[in-house]
Amino acid sequence: MLVIFLGILGLMASQVLGLPSNQPTGQLRPTEDPPEEELEYWCAYMESCQFCWDCQDGNCINKIDGSVIYKNEFVRPCSVSRWMDKCMYDLNKGIYHTMNCSQPQSWNPYKYFRKEWKKDEL
């Protein structure tokens, strides 16, 4: 009975706090290869990270939505980390982005380099 009560109390607390269900939790040391189950979260807010793409023969396929782009300066190596409620992107060269994990914000300084692949352009 106590277990059920604590479970319900925990569920109510997460709803009151408004924590997204897909929000990663815990600590994540800096990595260029985040856990597979967190890819959707990390790629939603900084889509040019190299770990979001599968690149071969000059084209890159997005691991989340399947979109295809030409490989260029848009796809960049980056590392991500998490401490408490701070999620951080490190794009090297002194470019960083920090956000509250529970209130994420999209950010992409390379968005102008994105070039969609079109089937007719062979």
From Swiss-Prot:
Point out the signal peptide segment.
1-18
- What keywords is this UniProt entry annotated with? Early protein, Glycoprotein, Host endoplasmic reticulum, Signal
* Keyword Glycoprotein assigned: yes
Keyword Ligase carried by entry: no
Upregulation: Expressed in the early phase of the viral replicative cycle.
Q: Where is this motif: Prevents secretion from ER?
A: 119-122
Q: How is it modified after translation?
A: N-glycosylated.
Q: Which Pfam families match?
A: v110
Where would you find this protein in the cell?
Host endoplasmic reticulum lumen
Family, as annotated:
Belongs to the asfivirus MGF 110 family.
Role summary: Plays a role in virus cell tropism, and may be required for efficient virus replication in macrophages.
This protein is called: Protein MGF 110-6L
What's the source species for this entry? Answer: African swine fever virus (isolate Pig/Kenya/KEN-50/1950)
